C-alpha cells in the first residue's frame, strides 16, 4: 500500500488556508454496483449553476463575445452509448486518467444538455485565458489538462466570488492566496488577477502533487482541502485511490473529479454534441506600465478618454478603482494605443481631481481649545493647567459589572473561552 508522507510545515500552512465545499444545487445519480442499485446525491460545483446571461455581463465578454451568425448551437444533443464515451475518453491525449462511470456520464449529460449554452460561452472565453493557463502549467511541468480546472471553479468568470469567499478564475481563498504570494488588502486583491492567480495556482497544484502523487486526489484537495482528503483516507483504512475514498468525501467533492473529467470531455468533443463556440473577436492589444503614485481609474478615464469599464476589466485586482502606487510600485494594464498618451500626460492625470478622489488626510491638527468643565478630581487653573486633589475618602465596594448587567460569571467564562479559541 502506498503511503503518503506530508511535509509538516507546508501542509500546516495549507490546512489553515484551504476552502471548504459549499453546496449550491444537487443532482441524483443511480449507481449500479455488483448487480445492485443505489441512489447517490451529489452537490454541483457552483460554476455549473451560473446562467449564461451572468457570464456575458463581464466587460470583455460583452465586447468580444457574441452568439455568432455563422454558427449556432443546436438544441439537438445526440445520444451515445457507454462504449463510445469510454473510447473517446481513452483516446484523449492526457497524463491524468479519465475513467468512465455513471457519475462521469451524469456530468457529461449535464454539460452537453442543459449547460450546452454555457459550454458555448466557455469555448469562446478559452481564447482569452487558455494561453495564460498553458504557459504556467507547462513551466511547472504539470499536465496541460489542468487548464480546464477553472471551468469547474468559475466557469471562466473572472469576477466569480463564492459564498465561502473564494475569488477569481481559480477561486483562491484569502489565506491560500497569501501563502502563494497573492496580495490582499482593502485596495488590492490579486486573486482577481488572471495572470498572477494562474501562476499561484500552478505552484499550489505542484505542491499538492508532491504530497499525494495522485492527480485525482490533488484536484479533490483543491476543492475541499488536504485536511478533508487526509481524513477521508484515514476513514477508508489508508486507501489512497479517489474512487475508494469517494464515500468519505463531502458531497460536492464527490462530484468534483467527475465534473473535471466531463469538462475535459466536452471541451474536446463538443462538435460531436452539436455545440458551437460563440463568436470571439480578437481583443485589442494591451501593455503594462509601472505606477509609483496613488492613481484613480477616473483620472485615467477623464484625461486619456479610455472607457472606465475597460480599465476595470484590464485591472480587476484593484478593488476600489484605486492603484495604490504610494505603498509600492504597481502595474497598470492599458490598451497599447493609450500607453504613450498616459506617459505624455502623467502630471495632468495625477493632478486631475486628486483632492476630490483622494480625501484621506495625511496630517491633522488637534483643536486648541480649553475645557471649562470641572470634575471631582481636579479643576483648571488660569494658565490652563489641571490641578489634581487626592481623594482620601474610603471608597465604597463596587458592585460587580456582571451583576449590574444581569450576566453570570459562567457566561463570562464561556465568552472568554470562545474568544480565546477563535483567536
Predicted features and spans:
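An acidic, Gly/Ser/Thr/Pro-rich helix-cap/linker signature
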Residues: 3, 7, 19-140
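Extracytoplasmic and endomembrane cell-envelope/extracellular-matrix remodeling and assembly machinery
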Residues: 75-121, 127-128, 139-140, 184-187, ...
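Hydrophobic h-region of N-terminal signal peptides that target proteins for export
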Residues: 12-19
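Short, surface-exposed glycine/acidic/tryptophan-bearing loops
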Residues: 102-103, 160-181
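Short glycine-biased active-site loop of nucleotidyltransferases that positions the nucleotide triphosphate
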Residues: 160-162, 323-324, 421-422
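Glycine-rich active-site/cofactor-binding loop and its immediate structural neighborhood
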Residues: 145-146
Amino acid at each position: 500500500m502506498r503511503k503518503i508522507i506530508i511535509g509538516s510545515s507546508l501542509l500546516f500552512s495549507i490546512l489553515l488556508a484551504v476552502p471548504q465545499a459549499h453546496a449550491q444545487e444537487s443532482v441524483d445519480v443511480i449507481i449500479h454496483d455488483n448487480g445492485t442499485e443505489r441512489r447517490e446525491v451529489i452537490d454541483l460545483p457552483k460554476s455549473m449553476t451560473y446562467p449564461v446571461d451572468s457570464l456575458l455581463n463581464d466587460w470583455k465578454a460583452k465586447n468580444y463575445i457574441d452568439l455568432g451568425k455563422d454558427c449556432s448551437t443546436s438544441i439537438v444533443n445526440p445520444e451515445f452509448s457507454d462504449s463510445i464515451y469510454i473510447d473517446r475518453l481513452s483516446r484523449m491525449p492526457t497524463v491524468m486518467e479519465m475513467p468512465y462511470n455513471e457519475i462521469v456520464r451524469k456530468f457529461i449529460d449535464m454539460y452537453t444538455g442543459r449547460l450546452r449554452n454555457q459550454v458555448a460561452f466557455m469555448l469562446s472565453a478559452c481564447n482569452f485565458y487558455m494561453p495564460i493557463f498553458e504557459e504556467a502549467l507547462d513551466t511547472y511541468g504539470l499536465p496541460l489538462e489542468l487548464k480546464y480546472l477553472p471551468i469547474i471553479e468559475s466557469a471562466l468568470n473572472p469576477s466569480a466570488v463564492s459564498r465561502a469567499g473564494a475569488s477569481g478564475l481559480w477561486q483562491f481563498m484569502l489565506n491560500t492566496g497569501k501563502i502563494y504570494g497573492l496580495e490582499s488588502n482593502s485596495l488590492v486583491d490579486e486573486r482577481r488577477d488572471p495572470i498572477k492567480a494562474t501562476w499561484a495556482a500552478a505552484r499550489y497544484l505542484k505542491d499538492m502533487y508532491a504530497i499525494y502523487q495522485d492527480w485525482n486526489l490533488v484536484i479533490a484537495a483543491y476543492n475541499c482541502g488536504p485536511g478533508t482528503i487526509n481524513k477521508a483516507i484515514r476513514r477508508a483504512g489508508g486507501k489512497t485511490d479517489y474512487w475508494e475514498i469517494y464515500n468519505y468525501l463531502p458531497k460536492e467533492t464527490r462530484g468534483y473529479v467527475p465534473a473535471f473529467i466531463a469538462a475535459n470531455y466536452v471541451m474536446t468533443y463538443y462538435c460531436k454534441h452539436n455545440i458551437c463556440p460563440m463568436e470571439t473577436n480578437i481583443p485589442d492589444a494591451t501593455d503594462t506600465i509601472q505606477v509609483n503614485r496613488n492613481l484613480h481609474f477616473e483620472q485615467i478615464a477623464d484625461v486619456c478618454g479610455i472607457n472606465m469599464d475597460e480599465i476595470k476589466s484590464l485591472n480587476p485586482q484593484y478593488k476600489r478603482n484605486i492603484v495604490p502606487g504610494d505603498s509600492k510600485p504597481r502595474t497598470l494594464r492599458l490598451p497599447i494605443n493609450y500607453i504613450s498618451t498616459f506617459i505624455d500626460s502623467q502630471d495632468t492625470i495625477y493632478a486631475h481631481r486628486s483632492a476630490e478622489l483622494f480625501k484621506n488626510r495625511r496630517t491633522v491638527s488637534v483643536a486648541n481649545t480649553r475645557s471649562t468643565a470641572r470634575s471631582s478630581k481636579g479643576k483648571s487653573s488660569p494658565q490652563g493647567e489641571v490641578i489634581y486633589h487626592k481623594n482620601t475618602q474610603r471608597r465604597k465596594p463596587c458592585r460587580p459589572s456582571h451583576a449590574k448587567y444581569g450576566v453570570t460569571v459562567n457566561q463570562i467564562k464561556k465568552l472568554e473561552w470562545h474568544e480565546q479559541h477563535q483567536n
